[in-house]
Structures are given as structure tokens and as C-alpha cells.
Amino acid sequence: MTKRPLGLGKKNKQKRHKPDEGADGKKESTPLDQIHVEVEGGGDPEDSVVQLKALWRNYLQSEREDERVLNGIVHECDRLLRNREQEGIELGEDFHSIYALALSELAIFRTEEKGQAGRESVGEFFDAAAERVDMGLQHFPASDVLALAKAKIIFQRIPLQYVSQLSPNNSEGADVGLQQLLEEGKSSFRVVAQDPLAVSEPLEIFSDLLEIIANFGREDEIDEGLDSDAEDEPEEVELPESHPLYELRQHLPEHAEWLQQQLLALFKVLEKPNAEEEESEATKFYRKIANKLGQSYLDAAAEPSIVFTTLTYETEDPSAEDEQKAQEAQRVAQGLTERAIEFFKEAESADDPQTWVDTAEVFISLGNLQENESETQEMLYKQAEEKMVRANKATNGKYKHILDTLLDSKT
């Protein structure tokens, strides 16, 4: 498989549109009534809460680069809170969720601010977001929507407020137990079937966080590796037990397993698309989650695959114990890789040859886990070759180098 880019705070590294400045140099927010929103689903366009939901939905579907929209949402939430009794406004779980998540999103913009003031600003916004979601849960303690929002805020907060201040040799910057905080977020997470996007985003943030933890201290070396043909990955940077990320790293396998289980739960509530829905957003989302699941199983297979390969092909005079370990590792790796293939197939698109290549590469990985030159191995390599040939033809030779490598390995 191709090397995966790190999820090192991708959002806060993107270019952001800052609020316009007034004549006095102060940042100006955009009032809600100056932002045009379209109300869907037959909602009352004069209803302030309906307008707020529409604006939030529009923001989520945008590039999320305009801080003014978030400021408009937060200001409107403040107004609704102040005037709820006077105007007879009923504020439900969605209102509290939007309010909290908008504050959390604003914290992302503050990560661009330098120095102590910037760090404090990030913390203040996350404090406000956490307070708001907890207040919502006081009113709606059984709300899955608010529980999910709380999980997302925690998953965002750990890398942006705490991990960003750390280095391998600097343990200052995290005055809370990060492992305990992450477990709190996991406990709060819910799969809300009626809003798959709201479910998937916290999981993406969680996945990015696991990569940050695993690769902490070697980001530059990995970035250089992504831009080169180097095969060897940089060695893991060891952390002292006193480091705030030490415990998180020790629990990485169980965190990865939790992520996989939540992706599975999300995938189960998605409808399998039909041929007529090839280009629909729902179909693209279905394939995206299928791809993530396939990758999660492939990642899980990596360690037993290495054990099998090392003991089988790189160990001279292996002992009986080594052979037993190799067989067990082979069995585990094969099962995980077979599961990965199932999901990569689900992620295939008739219009995207890269998805065929992704599946082909997993067939090769599974072939490498078979007895050398066995019928099963040859069959898997053949299936990979067929997909590679098809993709290569569809792209006028884009994958020729991969196909040539596969064919050379079979001769």
C-alpha cells in the first residue's frame, strides 16, 4: 500500500480567512442576518433556531475557512439564550450541540496565534465549548447528539491544546491526564444513525490523534520519507514514563481496536449504494468509510505480518517455538488481511482506478502471507494482476511501474 500522510493537525494548517478588520483595527464578526442561508426540509425560514441549524449545516458542508461564519453562529447562540424567554424560543439538544461545537471550531483558528496569548486563547475556547456541552447535558442527559459533541470536543482538544505544546524532551504543556481524558471522550462517543457525518468526523480526528501519538517526535523524518523512495521508516522516539504521551502510546493498540469497532458500527448503519447512486454523496461517504475500515484491518495485520516474514524467511535455523510463532502470526495476519480485502472491495468505484489498485495491493499482501509458490498464492497474485492491468489500461499506463514490479516478482 502507498504510504499514508500523517494527520498532524491538518485543519489548523490550512489557510484560513480571517475576520475583516474595522477602522479601529478590531476584528468584526458577521451578524447572522447578514449571512444568507437556505432552509431545507420544509422548516420555517422565520424560525431563528431553524435558521441557526441551516447556517451550521452550511458551514459543515463548506471548506470551513471563514471564521466570520462561526462568529455569526456563536453570536446568534448568545442572542437566543438571552432572549429565549422573551421570544418564547425552545432551545433543544441541537442548539446546545451547535453552540458547543462552534466554540470548539473557533479554537482551531486560534492555533495560528503565536506565543502564550495564542495558547491561552485556544484553551479558553475549549473551556467554553466543554462548559456549553456539559450544560446541554444537564438539560438533556440522555442526548446522544450532545454526548457525541462532547466526544468530538475532547478529541479535538487533546492534539490542539495539549500535544501541540509538547516535544520529546519537554513534558510541560499538559496539566491533565491525557489518557484519562481520551477515555472520557471514548465513553461519550455515540453512533447517531441519523447523522453519519457527525459520527465520522470525531472518528477521523481520533484516527489523526493516534497517528500523532505513534509518530510523535519523528514527524519531519516521516515527511521526508513521504517525499522520497526510502523504504525504511524512522525509528520510534522513546518517551520517558513521566511524559504526558507515554501512557497514551502504551494504549495505542486498544485505542486502534476501539476506532475499528466504532467504524464498523457506523458502517452498519449506512445503506449499501446501488448502481444508480454511483455519484451520490451518500455513495462517496459509504466508500470512504469502507476504505477506512479496510485500512484499519490492514494496519492491524502489519505486526503479525512482520513476525511471520521475519521468522519464516529471515531467521536461520528457526526453533520449533519460532515455527509455532510464525504459524500463529501467519494465521492472524491472513484473517485480518482477508477482512481488509472485503472492505477495500466495498470501497471500489467504477470511475476511480486508484480504488482498484488499492484492492490489488491488498491481494498482494495476502499472497505474501501464503506458502511460497502455493496455488493460493498464485491465485491471489493473479487477481491482483488482473486489477492492476485494468487500472493501468484505464489510466494510460499510470500504474505501469507497480504492474511491472508484480510481474517481475512472479518470474
UniProtKB/Swiss-Prot annotation:
**Keyword Transcription attached:** yes
UniProt family annotation: Belongs to the ETT1 family.
* Organism this protein belongs to: Eremothecium gossypii (strain ATCC 10895 / CBS 109.51 / FGSC 9923 / NRRL Y-1056)
Coiled-coil stretches, from where to where? none
Instruction: Give the taxonomic lineage as stored in the record.
Output: Eukaryota, Fungi, Dikarya, Ascomycota, Saccharomycotina
Function, in words: Required for correct translation termination and probably involved in regulation of hypoxic gene expression.
Q: Which domain of life does the UniProt lineage start with?
A: Eukaryota
Q: Which GO terms describe its cellular component?
A: nucleus
UniProt feature, compositional bias: Basic and acidic residues: 18-39
Region annotated Disordered, chain positions: 1-45
Give a yes or no for keyword Iron-sulfur in this entry.
no
Keywords for the protein's UniProt record, in alphabetical order = Nucleus, Transcription, Transcription regulation, Translation regulation
Q: What is this protein called?
A: Enhancer of translation termination 1
